[in-house]
Amino acid sequence: MILPAPHVEYFLLAPMLIVFSVAVAGVLAEAFLPRRWRYGAQVTLALGGSAVALIAVIVVARSIHGSGHAAVLGAIAVDRATLFLQGTVLLVTIMAVVFMAERSARVSPQRQNTLAVARLPGLDSFTPQASAVPGSDAERQAERAGATQTELFPLAMLSVGGMMVFPASNDLLTMFVALEVLSLPLYLMCGLARNRRLLSQEAAMKYFLLGAFSSAFFLYGVALLYGATGTLTLPGIRDALAARTDDSMALAGVALLAVGLLFKVGAVPFHSWIPDVYQGAPTPITGFMAAATKVAAFGALLRVVYVALPPLHDQWRPVLWAIAILTMTVGTVTAVNQTNVKRMLAYSSVAHVGFILTGVIADNPAGLSATLFYLVAYSFSTMGAFAIVGLVRGADGSAGSEDADLSHWAGLGQRSPIVGVMLSMFLLAFAGIPLTSGFVSKFAVFRAAASAGAVPLVIVGVISSGVAAYFYVRVIVSMFFTEESGDTPHVAAPGVLSKAAIAVCTVVTVVLGIAPQPVLDLADQAAQLLR
């Protein structure tokens, strides 16, 4: 039997192909370029490739008419929602690469209130030798040699490639492959912190083990759905479910599939990895995971729920109700007791997953549009917040180790007012205070949910937002209205690109709170999934 050659729509796949090509080029650069050239080459490849891919997304989006097109024998759906999410992932990637590249652990006191980064290549906050045992002679030798872990950039681009395919997947097998491609590099990058190596490696191990379990659940769910419907394509599953009378096997498959997706977004009760991983991973990687991974994972969840599961609407909606309520409640209540800023932001991200699920549960175009807007607003605020947390270093400045202990942040805003004001802006956005992007995004998802009859869910969300305001304001009060102590940390001086990226995050957070209509209109136009 002669199999026909598949028709590959290279134009529609251009953004994804560009990112994967950059990742492959980065691997080749690691293999063949001299060590002294690798850092500059990798940063240029990552930033340039992400920018070119973003341009490709815009070009493809301008050529899309109607609901979109299927590519590669229906395995990939290129529609407005996919391109919107891919563009968001690429914007986050550009900022994340800047924070990774310009980050340095070697600091020297220049003024009483500032630590200036030494004029050395970046990546000094990442271990020089990932395979070395912490504290071993091999690690010390790598440090003396000035080694840098430039493999970080191709790993990040491979993960970005998976993130771009994940929300575009139109069949479950492609979705599983994309899930693994985006996850495996993240497992490695979580364990690359120079300081607190054991904590970082513990975080990577926990993430890997729990991620492997969730992937197994996902794959088993795929098998059950295939057995129940005879197809792996999302439209095919929808049509088969609509024609069936016995949904027991399909429901079991959907439940197992949901475990994998809800683990990746960090919903309760699949959130246990988030606090440890966010605290132990290098802070630029934490910001990258907290923003980009959520965008990709929610894109995949939206596609499964809106394209494949309309016939099971009455079955999955009550389950997501319960998960959203648990996620908002557990995330908010647990964050109140945190004394480490990174762990507080981790539990805060869990609560935000519940808010975003509120938009998903609406199951209408308004809910889809509100969810897309929320993901954009949350991504910029999250990247900015973690970028600033990564600049706060211990009072003695030794090795440039971060100090995320909230009790040490007393008076930090008085010592470094610009940093304090910017972080306060991001925290107020997380709390949903008016004139910030967080207020508009929460209002959008709550309004969509209320219009779909989920008023009790909205009430829980509003109460959770009110409680969450406490621990955000607590950080602001500590920075500006508490006297300095001897443990008050210093703020490292970021590079020019990092300053620009943080400024962009701040401006976007404010502009989306004051004049959100252009992005809301863009999200409305993007709220079309290929069915």
Curated annotation (Swiss-Prot):
Membrane topology type: Multi-pass membrane protein
Keywords: Cell membrane, Membrane, NAD, Quinone, Translocase, Transmembrane, Transmembrane helix, Transport
Catalytic activity: a quinone + NADH + 5 H(+)(in) = a quinol + NAD(+) + 4 H(+)(out)
Pfam family for this entry, one: Proton_antipo_M
Entry superkingdom: Bacteria
Localization in the cell: Cell membrane
Keyword check for Transmembrane: yes
Transmembrane segments: 8-28, 41-61, 81-101, 146-166, 172-192, 208-228, 250-270, 282-302, 318-338, 350-370, 372-392, 418-438, 453-473, 500-520
Claim: Transmembrane helix is one of the keywords in the record: yes
GO cellular component, one term: extracellular region
MF-aspect GO terms: NADH dehydrogenase (ubiquinone) activity; NADH:ubiquinone reductase (non-electrogenic) activity; quinone binding
Swiss-Prot/TrEMBL GO biological process terms: ATP synthesis coupled electron transport
Main location: membrane
Family the UniProt entry places it in: Belongs to the complex I subunit 2 family.
Quaternary structure (record): NDH-1 is composed of 14 different subunits. Subunits NuoA, H, J, K, L, M, N constitute the membrane sector of the complex.
Protein function: NDH-1 shuttles electrons from NADH, via FMN and iron-sulfur (Fe-S) centers, to quinones in the respiratory chain. The immediate electron acceptor for the enzyme in this species is believed to be a menaquinone. Couples the redox reaction to proton translocation (for every two electrons transferred, four hydrogen ions are translocated across the cytoplasmic membrane), and thus conserves the redox energy in a proton gradient.
The name this protein goes by in its record: NADH-quinone oxidoreductase subunit N
